[in-house]
């Protein structure tokens, strides 16, 4: 809330709320400079939450009012603050490795993996990893520890059968893909499928 107020009052140029356009219609959101140093932040609203706590929500400010999320009773289902993410448990979650490192220190994060009030519900079943080629060497060794933890938290046990999450990774290079995935995720090499497959060797 304090960072939102700082944005509106022109006290800060740093926008921690990330969202710059409505993902539905493309209308501008975020900081817009005005006269006398003040700033408008269309699309960001400060409201009172159900627990009488102020929170920031995202509502499209489409001038034509033809966006589904510009209506008074609708807000965009986007959450960029950690506390909101832990509370809402969104269907799609974007994160970086440094957030993995915080998991042992945030007990409330267990809800993201299906643990709620001591019971286990369905955990995330699809992990998409971007820039796989960057996770190698010393960084890969460190990330591998957290990936093992994430895989375990996302594994579902049904009738003594382990159902592991599917992992899709994109990379700029496909050399030694099976070896890297085996080292990073602990998956058997025969379970790694490369697309597109290797072509013909020439020369």
What are these regions (language model features)?
Residues 98-101, 133-134, 172-177, 199-202:
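Conserved nucleotide-binding/hydrolysis micro-motifs of P-loop NTPases
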Residues 132, 162-165:
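Short beta-alpha connecting loops at secondary-structure transitions
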Residues 1-92, 97-101, 108-118, 122:
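A substrate-engagement module of RecA-like helicase motors
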Residues 92-95, 128, 165-171:
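Structural recognition of the conserved hydrophobic beta-strand(s) that form the central parallel beta-sheet
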Residues 84-87, 117-122, 155-163, 185-187:
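Conserved catalytic network of the ASCE P-loop NTPase/AAA+ motor domain
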Residues 98, 102, 111-156:
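SF2 helicase catalytic motif II
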Residues 177-203:
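Interdomain hinge/linker at the junction between the two RecA-like core domains of SF2 helicases
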Residues 107-112, 142-146, 182-190:
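Short secondary-structure boundary/capping segments
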């Amino acid at each position: 809330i304090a960072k939102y107020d700082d944005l509106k009052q022109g006290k800060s140029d740093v926008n921690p709320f990330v969202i710059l356009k409505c993902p539905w219609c493309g209308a501008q959101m975020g900081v817009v400079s005005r006269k006398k140093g003040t700033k408008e932040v269309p699309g960001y609203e400060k409201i009172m939450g159900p627990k009488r706590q102020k929170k920031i929500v995202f509502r499209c400010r489409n001038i034509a009012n033809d966006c589904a999320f510009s209506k008074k009773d609708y807000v965009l289902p986007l959450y960029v603050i950690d506390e909101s993410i832990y509370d809402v448990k969104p269907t799609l979650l974007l994160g970086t490795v440094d957030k993995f490192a915080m998991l042992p220190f945030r007990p409330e994060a267990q809800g993201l993996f299906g643990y709620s009030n001591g019971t286990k519900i369905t955990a995330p079943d699809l992990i998409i990893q971007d820039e796989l080629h960057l996770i190698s060497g010393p960084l890969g060794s460190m990330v591998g520890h957290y990936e093992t933890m994430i895989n375990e938290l996302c594994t579902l046990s049904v009738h003594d059968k382990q159902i592991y999450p599917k992992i899709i990774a994109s990379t700029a290079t496909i050399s030694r893909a099976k070896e890297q995935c085996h080292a990073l995720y602990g998956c058997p090499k025969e379970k790694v499928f490369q697309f597109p497959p290797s072509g013909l060797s020439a020369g």
